Amino acid sequence: MTPEYVMGLFHSAMKVTLMLASPLLLSALVSGLIISILQAATQVNEQTLSFIPKIISILVVITLLGPWMLGVMLDYMHNLFYNIPSIIIR
């Protein structure tokens, strides 16, 4: 197994991780930003108020994009397991 091959595996793993995590993180960021703007406009300083909308937005994103996320993860794992013999030989 060459260092280039290991770096390629690491690169593809990071790419899949970013693809799967970014929709969840972006939805939490947007909902938190909206709630923070509303809190600043109404001068409500409750720290725990933003958690429920974030949880709801993440659950909505998982519900909508869950099949796509599962497909991406399964494709990556299938390719990884399929290439195990070539990894061992190198």
UniProtKB/Swiss-Prot annotation:
State its location(s): Cell membrane; Bacterial flagellum basal body
Q: Where are the transmembrane segments?
A: 18-38, 55-75
Write out the entry's keywords from A to Z. Bacterial flagellum, Cell membrane, Membrane, Transmembrane, Transmembrane helix
For this protein, the record's InterPro entries field holds: Bac_export_3, FliQ
Q: Name one Pfam family in it.
A: Bac_export_3
Q: List the disulfide bonds.
A: none
User: One biological-process term from Gene Ontology?
Assistant: protein secretion
Lipid bilayer topology: Multi-pass membrane protein
Its GO CC terms are: bacterial-type flagellum basal body; plasma membrane
Role summary: Role in flagellar biosynthesis.
Q: Which family does it belong to?
A: Belongs to the FliQ/MopD/SpaQ family.
Q: PANTHER family annotated for this entry?
A: FLAGELLAR BIOSYNTHETIC PROTEIN FLIQ
Q: What is this protein called?
A: Flagellar biosynthetic protein FliQ
Question: Which species is the source of this protein?
Answer: Buchnera aphidicola subsp. Schizaphis graminum (strain Sg)
